[in-house]
């Protein structure tokens, strides 16, 4: 297989997908980019000079989606997908993997790669802390930080904050016996007193944790 002869279709509506599209173009790949993939019409599309709109998806070799990827969010595209497609994304739901297996569509879930998960967590942690520094007049050093969730990203964020001399507090429902020296651990957010006194709060939990009454308390800071 010569990848320069294959077609790559990138779906998504943020700068990461656009950056990936531009990277493929710079490398000479045959790529297209849609910013409107989760609606019933894909009109906002940019193409490389090899792509033709009358053949969208039906001959595409690689379909790259944002993470996470659920079947119901891209159902409008499935009539065009076929066994020659290769779906790439992450955190696929069971419905999507079952559909691909049933229709002999190849797929790859990036989150099945430990190296990808670790690298992605590091990059996400660095980006989150960088954004916090950019948008605050306070420094990380000497600050009081709360990290909600202690999965891959939460662990990396807490570790980096600690290295930058922040007082780190972590909320983790599945209490771990050890998460690092000098890190205060809470089982849930209701155990945290005076939440408004934290200088930085990083929410990595997959469920809604900062509910309205807590956000109202933060607004009074």
Question: Where are the regions a protein language model picked out?
Answer:
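N-terminal accessory targeting/assembly segments
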Residues: 4-5, 9-37, 45-51
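Short loop/helix-cap segments at secondary-structure boundaries that form the rim of catalytic
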Residues: 39-45, 96-102, 175-183, 195, ...
């Amino acid at each position: 297989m010569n990848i320069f002869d294959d077609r790559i279709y990138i779906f998504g509506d943020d700068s990461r997908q656009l950056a990936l599209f531009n990277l493929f173009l710079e490398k000479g790949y045959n790529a297209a980019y849609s910013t409107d993939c989760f609606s019933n019409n894909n009109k906002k599309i940019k193409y490389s000079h090899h792509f033709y709109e009358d053949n969208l998806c039906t001959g595409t070799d690689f379909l790259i989606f944002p993470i996470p990827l659920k079947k119901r969010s891209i159902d409008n595209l499935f009539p065009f997908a076929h066994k020659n497609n290769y779906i790439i994304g992450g955190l696929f739901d069971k419905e999507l993997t079952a559909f691909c297996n049933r229709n002999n569509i190849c797929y790859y879930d990036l989150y099945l790669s430990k190296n990808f998960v670790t690298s992605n967590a590091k990059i996400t942690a660095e980006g989150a802390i960088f954004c916090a520094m950019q948008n605050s007049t306070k420094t990380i050093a000497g600050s009081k930080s709360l990290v909600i969730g202690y999965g891959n990203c939460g662990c990396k964020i807490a570790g980096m904050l600690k290295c930058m001399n922040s007082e780190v507090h972590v909320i983790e429902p599945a209490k771990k016996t050890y998460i690092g020296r000098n890190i205060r651990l809470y089982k849930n957010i209701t155990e945290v007193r005076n939440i408004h006194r934290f200088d930085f709060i990083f929410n990595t939990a997959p469920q809604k944790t900062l509910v309205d009454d807590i956000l109202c308390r933060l607004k009074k800071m």
